[in-house]
C-alpha cells in the first residue's frame, strides 16, 4: 500500500513539475525580437530590438532593449521611455514600434546612447511636406536632424511542439 501511495505521489509531483516547466517556458518566450536598420546620407545604423509580446490599442509594441551599431559605434543602451535624449529636450521618447509599412515608430520615437557618449532619437515626422523618418543626433557640442529610411521586421522564431508523450516534434516556422 505504501509503495502504491509513493508511486501516486511521485507521478503527481512529476505532472505538477511538467506543467510548471511548461508555464515557465511559455513566459520565457513572452518577448519579440526584431531586426532594424536605418540609413540616410552618411548614417548607417542597424541592430535588434527586444519588445513586449503584447500590443497596445494602436498595434504598437514597447521596445525594452536595443543592440547594434550606428556608423560603427556600438549602441550602449536604450534611453528610458518618457525622457528626452540630452540636447533634444523637451521631445520625450515613447520607445514604441509596430508592424506597418509606414510610420512604424511614432513622432516620439526611440532613443539610445552609443559607446562613445553620443545620443540618438529616431522618430516619424508627420509634420514634413512628405512625412517620413528622421534622426536627431547629439554630442556634447553638436546637434543634427537628418532624414533617414527606416525598416524593422520581427524575427520569425521556430516553434517547438511536443506530442502527448512529451517527445519533441519537428520545428514549424510561424
Locate predicted features.
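Mature extracellular "passenger" or substrate-interacting domains of secreted, surface-exposed proteins
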Residues: 31-172
Amino acid at each position: 500500500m505504501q509503495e502504491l501511495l509513493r508511486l501516486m505521489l511521485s507521478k503527481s509531483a512529476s505532472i505538477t513539475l511538467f506543467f510548471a516547466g511548461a508555464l515557465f517556458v511559455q513566459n520565457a518566450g513572452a518577448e519579440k525580437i526584431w531586426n532594424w536598420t536605418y540609413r540616410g546620407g552618411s548614417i548607417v545604423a542597424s541592430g535588434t530590438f527586444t519588445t513586449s509580446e503584447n500590443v497596445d490599442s494602436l498595434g504598437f509594441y514597447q521596445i525594452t532593449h536595443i543592440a547594434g551599431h550606428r556608423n560603427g559605434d556600438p549602441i550602449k543602451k536604450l534611453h528610458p521611455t518618457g525622457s528626452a535624449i540630452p540636447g533634444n529636450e523637451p521631445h520625450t521618447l515613447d520607445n514604441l514600434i509596430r508592424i506597418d509599412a509606414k510610420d512604424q515608430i511614432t513622432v516620439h520615437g526611440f532613443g539610445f546612447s552609443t559607446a562613445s557618449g553620443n545620443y540618438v532619437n529616431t522618430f516619424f515626422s508627420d509634420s514634413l511636406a512628405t512625412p517620413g523618418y528622421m534622426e536627431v543626433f547629439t554630442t556634447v557640442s553638436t546637434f543634427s536632424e537628418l532624414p533617414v529610411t527606416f525598416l524593422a521586421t520581427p524575427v520569425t522564431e521556430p516553434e517547438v511542439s511536443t506530442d502527448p508523450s512529451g517527445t519533441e516534434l519537428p520545428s514549424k516556422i510561424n
